[in-house]
A protein has these predicted regions:
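Non-catalytic pre-domain segments flanking phosphatase-related domains
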Residues: 1-9, 25-28, 32, 240
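Residue-level marker for buried hydrophobic side chains located in beta-strands
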Residues: 7-9, 61, 200-201
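Active-site phosphate-binding/coordination module
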Residues: 20-112
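Asp-based phosphoryl-transfer active-site loop
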Residues: 3-20, 184, 211
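Asp-based, Mg2+/Mn2+-dependent phosphohydrolase catalytic module
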Residues: 191-195, 208-240
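Glycine-rich beta-to-alpha transition loops that act as phosphate-gripper elements at the mouths
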Residues: 43-44, 201-205
């Protein structure tokens, strides 16, 4: 691919198994790419957690859909947090709307809390509750059909948020305008990089996926449906 300056990546499902460490094989691919391109992580979670999952691979990281941003400092071999926004959340209103949706969809039984609130201002609607057993979460909606069936209704209930079909049993919400496209576009504008010079690599590009905003944009998108094929997908970018 010609004229590419920046390659941006999703993490879970793209570079790694969900919540699992970066494999040595995929780390080697990143190291090879770093010799030719500027690399960037664009994540839904905290920058520090992403950095740990990557085995402290030297890379700039956007976290929380753009609410957080950290640069890799080669001298300290650590992240330097440049932005860490914490936006307000009307918890009473969110709580009421989630409770109403639970009643509408028959999801009134849950373990723990009704809603999970994050310091950034992001919100998680955990269908099975904040203290659900992991096995129950994994088996609830593995193909996302249950959540996609009601996705538009959840979106309509939260017009001030970007809503995503998150994890195995939840909906994740980021305050507008924050999503991965907005975060990547902002990063490019700050560095003077055009969209034509960017490639994004992700797995969650279907309806409600948190990579969908980039997938539907003018940025070149490479789909990865299995993190074990990451090296194969990156081969054209490493070809002479």
């Amino acid at each position: 691919m010609k004229n590419v300056k920046l390659i941006a990546f999703d993490l879970d499902g793209t570079l790694t198994q969900h919540k699992e460490p970066l494999t040595e094989e995929n780390r080697c691919v990143l190291e090879a790419l770093a010799q030719r391109y500027q690399l960037l992580m664009v994540g839904a979670g905290q920058t520090r957690r992403i950095f740990r999952q990557l085995g402290e691979f030297p890379i700039d990281i956007i976290g929380n859909y753009g609410l957080q941003y950290a640069r890799y400092d080669a001298q300290t071999q650590d992240l330097q947090v440049m932005r860490d926004l914490q936006l307000p959340c009307d918890r009473d209103s969110v709580e009421q709307r989630v409770t109403q949706l639970r009643g509408r969809f028959g999801w009134e039984t849950y373990a723990g809390e009704n809603v999970e609130y994050h310091p950034s201002g992001c919100v998680t609607f955990p269908v099975l509750g904040t203290k659900a057993v992991q096995q129950d979460k994994l088996s609830f909606d593995p193909d996302r059909k249950k959540r996609r069936a009601v996705y538009e209704q959840v979106v309509a209930a939260f017009p001030e948020y970007h809503v995503f079909v998150g994890g195995s049993s939840s909906f994740d919400m980021a305050p507008k305008p924050y999503n991965k496209y907005h975060a990547l576009d902002e990063y490019c504008r700050e560095l003077g990089i055009t969209h034509e010079q960017v490639v994004y690599v992700g797995d969650d590009y279907g309806p409600g996926g948190n990579d969908e905003s980039v997938y539907l944009s003018d940025i070149t998108f490479i789909t990865v449906d299995d993190y074990r094929t990451f090296g194969e997908k990156m081969a054209p970018l490493l070809a002479d």
